[in-house]
Amino acid sequence: MLLLFLNSVGFIVPVLLAVALLTLIERKMLGYMHVRKGPNNVGPYGLLQPIADGFKLLIKETLKPSNASPYLFYSSPALFLFLAILLWSIIPVGESTLNFNLSLVLILGLSSLSVYSLLGSGWSSNS
């Protein structure tokens, strides 16, 4: 069980670090194209900017429309996150992870369910 956890973490952490680094590189390149430095205030050379962006995202206030259905308004993004994590669990990482013969069909089926999350988000705002 511990080996499976470490194997999964060893797969997910480098992917997340690569996404953070590529986002930083993209922002730096866009800054240089606009004749400015890009993110450079957070940490040396702006290397901690993705961490600051993630922290800022976590502390943002959630705004709910006044006439929105609260249950559907909050459960739709949770459904989307659940489906995304479920899709990640199908990817074979080691010997003891999920490995189906019909995993492509399962991926297509689960990804088609994300439409209901978007539909619920729009419907819950009553607009």
From Swiss-Prot:
GO CC term, one of those recorded: mitochondrial inner membrane
Any single Pfam family the record assigns to this protein: NADHdh
Enzyme Commission code(s) on record: 7.1.1.2
Keywords for the protein's UniProt record, in alphabetical order: Electron transport, Membrane, Mitochondrion, Mitochondrion inner membrane, NAD, Respiratory chain, Translocase, Transmembrane, Transmembrane helix, Transport, Ubiquinone
Membrane topology: Multi-pass membrane protein
Biological process per Gene Ontology, one example term: aerobic respiration
Location of this chain's protein in the cell: Mitochondrion inner membrane
Alphabetical list of InterPro entries matching this protein: NADH_UbQ_OxRdtase_su1/FPO (IPR001694), NADH_UbQ_OxRdtase_su1_CS (IPR018086)
Transmembrane regions: 2-22, 71-91, 100-120
Single GO MF annotation: NADH dehydrogenase (ubiquinone) activity
Catalytic activity, as annotated: a ubiquinone + NADH + 5 H(+)(in) = a ubiquinol + NAD(+) + 4 H(+)(out)
EC class name: translocase
Coarse class of the protein's main subcellular location: mitochondrion
Similarity comment text for this entry: Belongs to the complex I subunit 1 family.
Function summary: Core subunit of the mitochondrial membrane respiratory chain NADH dehydrogenase (Complex I) that is believed to belong to the minimal assembly required for catalysis. Complex I functions in the transfer of electrons from NADH to the respiratory chain. The immediate electron acceptor for the enzyme is believed to be ubiquinone.
Protein name, entry field: NADH-ubiquinone oxidoreductase chain 1
